[in-house]
From Swiss-Prot:
This is Methionine--tRNA ligase. The keyword Lipoprotein does not apply. It comes from Burkholderia vietnamiensis (strain G4 / LMG 22486) (Burkholderia cepacia (strain R1808)). Signal peptide: none annotated. A motif ('HIGH' region) lies at residues 27-37. The gene is metG. Keywords: Aminoacyl-tRNA synthetase, ATP-binding, Cytoplasm, Ligase, Metal-binding, Nucleotide-binding, Protein biosynthesis, RNA-binding, tRNA-binding, Zinc. The lineage of its organism: Bacteria, Pseudomonadati, Pseudomonadota, Betaproteobacteria, Burkholderiales.
Amino acid sequence: MSATDLASVQAAAPQGSRQILVTSALPYANGQIHIGHLVEYIQTDIWVRTLRMHGHEVYYIGADDTHGTPIMLRAEMEGLTPKQLIDRVWAEHKRDFDSFGVSFDNFYSTDSDENRVLSEKIYVALKENGLIAEREIEQAYDPVKEMFLPDRFIKGECPKCHAKDQYGDSCEVCGSTYLPTDLLNPYSVVSGATPVRKTSTHHFFRLSDPRCESFLRDWVSGLAQPEATNKMREWLGDAGEAKLADWDISRDAPYFGFEIPGAPGKYFYVWLDAPVGYYASFKNLCERKGINFDAWVRPGATAEQYHFIGKDILYFHTLFWPAMLEFSGHRTPTNVFAHGFLTVDGAKMSKSRGTFITAQSYIDTGLNPEWLRYYFAAKLNATMEDIDLNLDDFQARVNSDLVGKYVNIASRAAGFLIKRFDGRVQDSAMNHPLVAKLRSAIDSIAAHYEAREYSRALRQTMELADEVNAYVDGAKPWELAKDPANAVALHETCSVSLEAFRLLSLALKPVMPRVAQAVEAFFGIAPLAWADAAKPLSSAQPINAYQHLMTRVDAKQIDALLAANRGSLQADGAAAAAASGATGAAAAKDAKPAKANAKAAAANAANDGPISIDDFAKIDLRIAKIVACQAVEGSDKLLQLTLDVGEEKTRNVFSGIKSAYQPEQLVGKLTVMVANLAPRKMKFGLSEGMVLAASAADEKAEPGLYILEPHSGAKPGMRVK
């Protein structure tokens, strides 16, 4: 359905009659959700909530993306089956999405019967349409692990600049691209063995077929984002250029995924069954809710279908996915909305700086998830522009907009209304010009949200909040309250303020649903919808006692968040990097389009292989005696240790073991420290080493930290060999 066709359908349809299926990209099930992921899920959730508030039938669908070589290797490293790993990660992802108010109607898994059946059905239909081809290809093969290696699981010496430890397809030092066969001294990231060349039969989706090209040239005209349209036209090229390449949709055993029908030992490549997972998750919901699944996904369906994705996976969602659907007997997406990447303080997220922030660490630090929802929304628009989380600006904007402007309105008026007027508004005040102005602005704000221009919606909302605060400042209810003769004016001022606050809460509801829920309870009203702009507060319904809605962001919370994430992602960082070399929304797979997001994490992969005795000898491990220990003010995780390591003076070390030990428990104990670690300047002081502690790979399932204690007889300063 083109954009023009969609507009005519929407114009002809009465409000509330639209049927809309919405998806976000599927997070890969080998790592934690971080704030970079959350940009997309918050963006999608705001849009979904906006549509629901219009009364439309909207289903927001998600799932974990669970197949592929990285999952298989990660599970092996952790001593788990792939199923055990993906079940654990699913629970963690679901927890994080719930924490941030991401309102999936169904959050499922691509490792499901529904997905297997649908993937097989689509494959068979494509094959019957002559769009599946088989070809012999030569690949790198690990003779130790007995598996074919994707490009990024091979490293070696760049053939151009001779930089060491470069990937099988490109050099991060000189920027050259090449074939894996061009690498000098190649080795397998998985085992360290030298790869050999081996041929195998692979299955290809014939995207180069003229039918696919013709369809895609027509379909691209309906995309809402000019950047997406331009990129697709670049990929398609001019008519007759034949720029589209066939797509390898199979992988060889061993592989965690679905076996291809009629092809023993061959499995669907993860990028084939992953988008089918959208439909599988929706089908699972339909079966539970009694919804007619086929009516939503058949060709010509009047229901709308939208995909929110990161711009790094536009290729899959605007070429392969629509073509797969078109030629397998399904409807095609109404539109695909791509967003940019997230930077923090103007730079890529960094573990060393603590800006690679996980969703769980944000919650554990005590930060309000609706602060982040608001901040992201204030930056987001309908383009693919990258957005930046500036932590100073985050604190200033939340404190100014949400506390200083918005929440302040209710806190200034509620007490007077309850104390002086039994909590009942003045009905005549509901027609005040200021109230009328806010009421008339709601349609415009809602339209900005639906157009994905969230920054415009919030800018307009905060401009109105400024006007309300100016009105309160001018009316001075605190002065009016001093003289009983001003009772009518005081009543009007408080009533206008609270009705304005209700309308501002309506405008903010898609962004801050939990605050809106608290406001609804405060006013004793039903859940707010856009149509409720015309339904003012009434004297017939007294307000309830005002409960504080939001606190200010404290700089100490930001510092604690950075400290918690500095050098973290322990299990999911090290293991996932070794297993996949990738993080990012639905992009951590053995696929080149994921490479941009994968490089930073993948660079750690080589460090997890075997090391030589010379490498180990570089680490100076010493026996240390804890002569003093104290908690670190302002930190939930750190203890400050004073250590005797047999030198003339003691060492000062900060250690993240506060959750496991009281300071007095450690004084006098012997432990082991890394004595030659470079001193590190921290907010709380200089840390001059590292104390060793043990923990389970899955600290959620098996919590606990245990410092190492040598046998009696060991003395401070002794070297551990």
